[in-house]
Structures are given as structure tokens and as C-alpha cells.
Amino acid sequence: MSKEKEVLLNEEIRADEIRCVGDDGKVYGIISSDEALEIANRLGLDLVMIAADAKPPVCKIMDYGKFRYQQEKKQKEAKKKQKVIDIKEIKLSVKIAQNDINYKVKHALEFLEQGKHVRFRVFLKGREMATPEAGVALLEKIWTMIENEANRDKEPNFEGRYVNMLVTPKKA
């Protein structure tokens, strides 16, 4: 289930010779895996393979349960620090009135002030599909109204029945 690679522990380590390091940083040098396992058992710890690719493989004597707990804790911290980008979508049509454009732009500016990304989508109906330039022209008109408050990620582009434009808030 977990995506992390399987770690070899104790008896699972099949190498004849390994480079062994203690939990406290003590270097045991290149010793047999049986000898390293004996040292780990004497200390009440686990023998964990850290670098299987190295010649000879590198193993560390440590408390594996504690090590795994710390790894999971680091992953949770990293996940908390990730920023989720919220994209708000504003749908338009080619035959939209100027007052409606002003209303939608006002909402877009509110979203941008909140730090959200805004995607403008112009839906092309029927014969409007033959001239997507009208949708691009509408998005350019909207861009002139918001360019002081936003950065344009992409030029207006045509996808299926839509002409899209993504804008992001300007950095303060």
C-alpha cells in the first residue's frame, strides 16, 4: 500500500560484507553481516540497510521503529507546508453584455485579492465555434481591465468548445 521502498532489516540483509555505522555515529568499518547483526542484537537495536547500491552496502545499527516514526513525522510536516492552489473559474459567453463583464471582473478581482488563481472560460455555442477569435477578443478585453492586479499565466488558448485564460495574483 505504501509508496516508500521496502527497507531490509536484520536477517533480510544477505550481503557477506557490509560497511556498518552505529546509531551514535560510531563507525564499525567493513564487517560481516553476521557480526553486525550480533552487535545490533547485543545493543537491542535493529540492523537497517541504508544504501544497498554502495560497495559494500551501508548498514546502520538503529531503533527501526523510532526511525520509521521520525520519517512519517517528517512526511506529515512536509505535507502541511505544501500550499494548495485554489483556482476559481468564471464562465462567459461571446454575447455577454458590458455590465455583466464588469460584474464578473469585479468578482475576479476579489478572488485575486484573496490569493486565488482565476480561469476565465468563454463557451462557444453553435456557429461561434467557426470564429473562436471572438472569444479571444473578449478575453483580451477582460485582460485590459485586470492587468494591473494580475499576471497572465497563458495567452488565451482554444480547447474544445472553450477559449481559456488563466490569471494569477501579482506578488506583493
Curated annotation (Swiss-Prot):
Family per similarity comment: Belongs to the IF-3 family.
Keyword Cytoplasm part of the UniProt annotation: yes
Species the sequence originates in: Campylobacter jejuni (strain RM1221)
Role this protein plays: IF-3 binds to the 30S ribosomal subunit and shifts the equilibrium between 70S ribosomes and their 50S and 30S subunits in favor of the free subunits, thus enhancing the availability of 30S subunits on which protein synthesis initiation begins.
Subcellular localization(s) per the UniProt record: Cytoplasm
Principal localisation: cytoplasm
Quaternary assembly: Monomer.
Keyword Nucleotide-binding attached: no
Protein name (Swiss-Prot/TrEMBL): Translation initiation factor IF-3
Gene Ontology cellular-component annotations: cytosol; membrane
Organism domain of life: Bacteria
GO molecular function terms noted in the UniProt entry: ribosome binding; translation initiation factor activity
Keywords per UniProt: Cytoplasm, Initiation factor, Protein biosynthesis
InterPro entries: T_IF-3_C_sf, T_IF-3_N_sf, Translation_initiation_fac3_CS, Translation_initiation_fac_3, Translation_initiation_fac_3_C, Translation_initiation_fac_3_N
A biological-process GO annotation: ribosome disassembly
